[in-house]
Amino acid sequence: MNTSLFIAKRLYAKENNNNYTRPIIRIAISAIALSVAIMILSVFVLSGFKSDISNKVFGFGGHINISKFSFNQSYENDPINYNTELSSEIESMDFVNYIQAYATKAGIIKNNNEILGVVLKGVDQNYNWSFFYENLISGDTPSFNDSVAKNSILISQNISKKMKLNVGDDMLIYFMEQPTRVRKFIVSGIYKTGLSEFDDITAIGDLKHIQKLNNWDINQIGGYEISVANFKNIEKYTSLIDESIDYDLKALSIKHKYPQIFDWLRLQDFNVLIILI
């Protein structure tokens, strides 16, 4: 065979082969790039979802909780004395954003023929409302002072819809004491976080009401909520705070107070692994 003819045929065949495979290679590269982009986007979406849920839980309960050392798991707190020195000491720690007093008490809302179990969270005039400001959909957050108990109360949209309550409406909460005790509140605002575990039951009112209902002194509270700067170090911070409080108190991280939520969030990491694999 003529050498020139042989070389020409080989070059022609190679060119035809390149023309045939080039679109396939381009499609394959595009598919790989799209897959990688989807994986990266999925990881970011899942990470954002976990962060959003965590921040909402922090908004309801802080990062670290200080309460009476007991085995009480109910919404009826064992009282502790508010300690100004302890509060100042903890707030001076470089990783602490703020510390605030609270107490909780279970009750039943009754409106016409509707009833609903709720948890009244009592807070004082120093409470940080920033989380609820961000999630407020109607009205305003309550304003309390250090002298007279206020009847203003903040409820969720879920409670508002179930009980047909709006801003400015009167609301009765019954507390199962002996005998049953009732308190009248006025709805000052309505919030919505989308976290039904809390939205379904949580109302925010004046700490003084819980103190009176429980026959506590004015200096007695249910506990402290603490916000810290870096959640990743929460276990370390919890240990440091636990070492600084009296033996009859305990410091508990929010991860251990609501383990079911954070265990579920941790399971979402497996979804990331599945996506990456």
Please give the residue ranges for each predicted region.
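Hydrophobic, regular-secondary-structure patches
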Residues: A37, F44-V119, F144-V148, E243
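A short beta-strand structural signal in non-transmembrane regions
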Residues: I64, S160, N219-L240
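A structural signal for hydrophobic secondary-structure junctions
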Residues: T84-I218
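Helix N-cap motif at beta-to-alpha junctions
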Residues: P79-I80, T84, D206, N230-N233
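N-terminal Sec/SRP start-transfer signal
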Residues: M1-A37
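Short amphipathic alpha-helical coupling elements at transmembrane boundaries
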Residues: F6, R10-A13, S51, N55-G62, ...
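A generic structural motif
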Residues: S70, D124-N126, Y191, K232, ...
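Peri-transmembrane interface segments
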Residues: N16-R26, N230, I234-I277
